[in-house]
Amino acid sequence: MPQMAPIGWLSLFIIFSLTFILFSMMNYYSTIPQSPKSQILKKSQTNSMNWKW
């Protein structure tokens, strides 16, 4: 079975590292965070329930 040269392992490691970083960045930036204003409005709307006992 042939052995790989150290530069082959290094290039393989660099390729896998770059693809991992690329997919991680794509996953991070694919979601669009909601603005804080909409979250504050949602909280105020849910907390303003008037219970009539």
Curated annotation (Swiss-Prot):
Main location: mitochondrion
Spans through the membrane: 6-26
InterPro entries, sorted: ATP8_metazoa (IPR001421)
The keyword Transmembrane helix is assigned to this record: yes
Pfam families in the record: ATP-synt_8
UniProt keyword list: ATP synthesis, CF(0), Hydrogen ion transport, Ion transport, Membrane, Mitochondrion, Transmembrane, Transmembrane helix, Transport
Topology in the lipid bilayer: Single-pass membrane protein
Job of this protein: Mitochondrial membrane ATP synthase (F(1)F(0) ATP synthase or Complex V) produces ATP from ADP in the presence of a proton gradient across the membrane which is generated by electron transport complexes of the respiratory chain. F-type ATPases consist of two structural domains, F(1) - containing the extramembraneous catalytic core and F(0) - containing the membrane proton channel, linked together by a central stalk and a peripheral stalk. During catalysis, ATP synthesis in the catalytic domain of F(1) is coupled via a rotary mechanism of the central stalk subunits to proton translocation.
Subunit relationships: F-type ATPases have 2 components, CF(1) - the catalytic core - and CF(0) - the membrane proton channel.
Similarity section: Belongs to the ATPase protein 8 family.
Protein name, as recorded: ATP synthase protein 8
Organism per entry: Ceratitis capitata (Mediterranean fruit fly)
Lineage, broadest ranks: Eukaryota, Metazoa, Ecdysozoa, Arthropoda, Hexapoda
Gene: mt:ATPase8
